A protein has these predicted regions:
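Active-site microenvironments in enzyme catalytic cores
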Residues: 1-24, 35, 44-255
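Short, surface-exposed terminal/edge motifs of secreted or surface/virion proteins that either
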Residues: 29-41
Length: 255
């Protein structure tokens, strides 16, 4: 009989159960799993055994995209069933469905089609504004009225632990011409990233009242920034090379 023990201080109790994409040495195929304590639950095996009540098929995918697109009713149904399976119905689980976390290799959880970074913290916007424009002009007038953001580079989103190469670009020394060099002011920003699951038709806005039904889950996000490159290039259209070289996210998506 399987007995899953979870340390009281674990970040991954039964109340969490985040989703991710993983592989193992014995089975290099990418598939979907859920984190429970020091274990990864192989959802593809559970699905193959019809333990969710019906077979979904998307847990054998190399990304969460089809699962995310299924919508909130399916998300809720699977989560409720998974909680029962790893809780009161542990006896129905196969041993092969539980893999020690140190034996898995994590992968990017989602095929990311687009990525928008919002400038949502007043304190952060003020501090960066002071860095570039001085204290008197730190906060731009539009910040108080609209969600300031920029489109990042989806192809350079990587999971935590991936090496980040220091970017090179133009910087403008004081009282000297711009020069092409490696960034000397590489910065990091701890943020939260939201994955949108169910989409919308082109040109049709999502209302505030229904936005919750479209948000699949959250990850920790590090918006790497080359501040010296950014200071020279950001006017008039905002950051470009200063922020498109890497964005790190956690491999587990908390829902």
């Amino acid at each position: 009989m399987i007995n899953i023990e979870i340390h009281p201080d674990s970040d991954f109790p039964i109340q969490n159960l985040p989703y991710g994409v993983f592989s193992t040495i014995s089975n290099p195929s990418l598939r979907v799993g859920a984190r429970l304590g020091d274990w990864v639950v192989d959802l593809a095996i559970l699905d193959n055994e019809n333990l969710f009540g019906r077979r979904y098929g998307f847990f054998r995918d190399s990304s969460l995209n089809r699962f995310m697109a299924a919508g909130r009713d399916v998300w809720r149904e699977i989560r409720q069933r998974l909680i029962r399976l790893v809780g009161e119905e542990q006896a129905s689980l196969k041993k092969e469905a539980l893999i020690p976390v140190h034996e898995v290799q994590m992968h990017l959880p989602v095929e990311i089609g687009d990525y928008t970074d919002f400038y949502a913290s007043r304190e952060h916007a003020t501090n960066v504004g002071i860095m570039f424009r001085g204290r008197e002009n730190a906060l731009m007038p539009n910040w108080l009225h609209l969600p300031v953001g920029y489109h990042g580079r989806a192809s350079s989103v990587v999971i935590s632990g991936t090496d980040v190469i220091r970017p090179r670009g133009q910087v403008k020394p004081k009282d000297a011409p711009p020069e092409f060099t490696a960034s000397r002011q590489l910065d990091f920003e701890l943020e939260m990233g939201f994955f949108v699951g169910k989409g919308n038709d082109l040109g049709e806005p999502i209302s505030i009242e229904t936005a919750h039904d479209h948000i699949f889950g959250m990850v920790l996000l590090n918006d790497w920034s080359a501040r010296d490159i950014q200071a020279w290039e950001y006017q008039p259209l905002g950051p470009f090379l200063a922020k498109n070289f890497a964005t790190s996210i956690s491999p587990w998506v908390v829902t």
